[in-house]
């Protein structure tokens, strides 16, 4: 299921400890400073 994450609380299809939602279903670690990851976190 989707979980809320990121500053704006957008829902994301993947979950990881401290994640930011960029585009739908795309997450990146909150420590990442460069754009969004193209990989999915489970």
Curated annotation (Swiss-Prot):
* Cellular localization per UniProt: Secreted
Keywords assigned by UniProt? Disulfide bond, Ion channel impairing toxin, Neurotoxin, Secreted, Toxin, Voltage-gated sodium channel impairing toxin
Keyword presence, Disulfide bond: yes
Tell me if Acetylation is a UniProt keyword of this record: no
What family, per the record? Belongs to the conotoxin I1 superfamily.
Record's comment describing the protein's domains? The cysteine framework is XI (C-C-CC-CC-C-C).
Name of the protein described by the UniProt record: Iota-conotoxin-like R11.16
Q: Which organism is it from?
A: Conus radiatus
């Amino acid at each position: 299921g989707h979980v809320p994450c990121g500053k704006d609380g957008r829902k994301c299809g993947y979950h990881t400890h401290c994640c930011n939602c960029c585009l739908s279903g795309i997450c990146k670690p909150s420590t990442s400073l460069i754009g969004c990851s193209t990989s999915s976190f489970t």
